[in-house]
Amino acid sequence: MDKKLERILPLVQKPARYTGGEYGEIQKDKSEVDLRMALCFPDTYEIGMSNTGMRILYQVLNDLPGVWCERVFAPWFDMDRQMREKGLPLYALESGDPLSEFDAIGFSLGYEMAYTTVLEMLDLAGIPLRSAERTSLTPLVFAGGSVCCNSEPMADFFDLMIIGEGESVDGEVLQLLREAKAAGWSKAEFLRRAALIGGVYVPSLYTPEYNGDGTLKAMRAAPGAPERITKRIVTDFENSCFPVDAIVPSTEIVHDRVGLELFRGCIRGCRFCQAGHIYRPVRSRSVEKCMEYGKESLAFSGYHEITLLSLSTSDYRGLNELCDGLMDYCESRGIGLSLPSLRADNFSMDIMQRVQKVRKSGLTFAPEAGTQRLRDVINKNVTEEDLLRSCAVAFQGGWNSVKLYFMLGLPTETDEDVLGIAELADRVVHCWRENSPNRSHGLRVTVSTSCFVPKPHTPFQWEPQVTREEYMRRVTLLRDNMKARAVTYNWHDADTSLTEAVLSRGDRRLGAMIENIWRQGGFLESWSEGFDLKRWERAAEEEGISFPFYANRERSLDEVLPWDHLYMGVNRRHYIHEYEQAHQGLLSPDCRAQCSGCGAAAFLKGGRCDG
């Protein structure tokens, strides 16, 4: 261990974040590898080690011949300060080597509020922030993850960005980098060739042009670069990598359990949901494969809980069979099985009673909107009757805790829709009184609301976000009408949602603002300790950026959007159709009931999703 690190660790919170050496960590002989890759997560160890994508990529990249992939996480504020004061550069956990010594540095980006943390990590490693400032071939700095579906706000900082699922592309990028090192290519030559790999976006080869009103006129590709970058996906999901021997953290993390991924994509088509669109087509694993992975992961890790992961776990075709099989294994070993947020329209009490035998937890539903009219607008395809029926069954089974998640500020929302949330919560309380066999323990209903953030690659990508003031007015209206003592109301911070809305639909001009914020000390801004709206407003004013232009402005359907050249598999015609359906209050069937012809099925052999 570095002597500077030895002196620092007693001075910071949770020093185990920074030491590595966990059970399952991959160590390699440096003399036997010719490419060193740093897999960076721009948040704390506890968040990054809970991320399923990080665990998968760590395994996939270390399985490549001649490659050693190591992990790097953002230090907390106290550690960051100590590292700067003591002159300790950012390092990888496995070897302790400085980040600047690696051939490739890849960031996993899943949230827009992590952008400034990327800059903090690069600077802490002594690496120039902007791609244009890094003239040598290595270290190659790139990114992947869900927010790369709009790459433009961070385009100036990365050499390239992965569009789609990284485990299907990263190996090709590293192989090309290996060839480039051996042949002595310039960075420009490498990037020119990398741009020809499917799913690779090289921002420096594309120049945005703007109209007089500030909207995007066109994205001009350099000669030889593709006009449109099409995402890459894992086509054989059944046999794709699942890290059964994943690292077991030596300190507590957010999701301290086995996370078993059942399928990718979603059949539902909720119009606000970015993940449900960009992860199409639906691909699932067989019950047998899930059973195999689940048991092996539990045996290796020693965890006493396993959770079933997907965008809509209750839509997994073999859920009953899988839960039965896993519980046969788990019950005798005292291992708990948990399910994430459930859909009220296919809630199964049989499943819940079985999985709660070891460890009982509360129920979580996400109606998203307070009235049926608005649920139809967003294509939620869940009725109030569905929710109350599911709650009644649960209360009859002895449950006395329910969490309900909603959004405020959805397109076409009125005060009647807002008040509908309070009325629905009251009906849940009444339902408990009518159905609970034992009311002595009382009822806890937790209602949580967040502010709707319009996202790229969704039918609502053209919609405005309500202003901060309007969001808080609706929060106050709802809070004042929550009368039942059994109901607790929580709401998400309006300032963060506004900033997220700016970044999520931003263009390349935001890069200067992001760097400005970082230079003012901004990083780890997904945490309340790190976020400061005044800092963002100050930087926006200095860089000539209008928050209302990006967050609160309605786009026309023919406007050129900053992400139009990045094809995530769903065609524009489908988004427009769903946008029009929403404004007519019309539902669209789920993918299992009827194919919408969105275009995503073309990624799979035979052109058919596993809906």
Q: Where would I find each of the regions flagged by the language model?
A:
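Glycine-rich beta-alpha loop elements in corrinoid/cobalamin-binding modules
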Residues: P75-R220, P459-D507, E515-S528
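Canonical Radical SAM [4Fe-4S] cluster-binding loop centered on the CxxxCxxC motif
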Residues: N51, E252-E288, G597-G611
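N-terminal [4Fe-4S]-dependent radical SAM core
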Residues: I8-A38, Y45-E46, P203, E209-G259, ...
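Radical SAM enzyme core and accessory elements
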Residues: D2-Q27, S31, M37-L39, A484-G611
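Flexible glycine/acidic-rich beta-alpha junction loops that bind and position SAM and/or redox cofactors
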Residues: F77-D78, P153, T207-G212, R317-G318, ...
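N-terminal pre-triad scaffold of radical SAM enzymes
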Residues: M37-D43, L61, V248-Q274, L298, ...
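Conserved SAM/AdoMet-binding glycine-rich loop
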Residues: L39-C40, M113, K295-K403, L408-T446, ...
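A short beta-strand-loop structural module common to alpha/beta enzyme folds
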Residues: G66-D78
